[in-house]
């Protein structure tokens, strides 16, 4: 996965990355007035995910502060598509309360990643600690090819 932001929509999407299924938003850079609610929710809706590959596994880490593990779903779709989704509900308002500021976001999020052929999708594990979701996908062992030297005659 490229660490350089895409020219088509910043770091959240990269049209050249075969593993990313995030959609390019052609209207993202247009400055069209939107509701203040959608702008405030964008930090939650556009959940950032880091993906690294080690010798043994693919490891994805998502910052999802304020959610319980019961509010987050991790699933494999269509054999090789990892989907991370969740929802934070709006806090109930008491009509007698006076709000001075509302910065915490609410809403739904969903991120999808196409897993490579060497991923053991039947052994995926997920854990959540301190608002960070970690998904570990073990890799198939790379078969070492048998090398047989051929003598050159002549």
From Swiss-Prot:
Organism: Glycine max
Record flagged with keyword Translocase: no
Similarity field: Belongs to the small heat shock protein (HSP20) family.
Record gene name: HSP17.6-L
Location in or out of the cell: Cytoplasm
Pfam family, one: HSP20
GO MF terms, alphabetically ordered: unfolded protein binding
Keywords: Cytoplasm, Stress response
Top-level taxon of origin: Eukaryota
Biological processes per GO annotation: protein complex oligomerization; protein folding; response to heat; response to hydrogen peroxide; response to salt stress
Main location: cytoplasm
Signal peptide: none
Quaternary structure, from the entry: Forms oligomeric structures.
InterPro entries for this protein: A-crystallin/Hsp20_dom (IPR002068), HSP20-like_chaperone (IPR008978), Small_HSP (IPR031107)
Chain ranges of the sHSP domain: 40-154
Name recorded for this polypeptide: 17.6 kDa class I heat shock protein
Cytoplasm is among the record's keywords: yes
SUPFAM superfamilies membership: HSP20-like chaperones
Organism taxonomic ancestry: Eukaryota, Viridiplantae, Streptophyta, Embryophyta, Tracheophyta
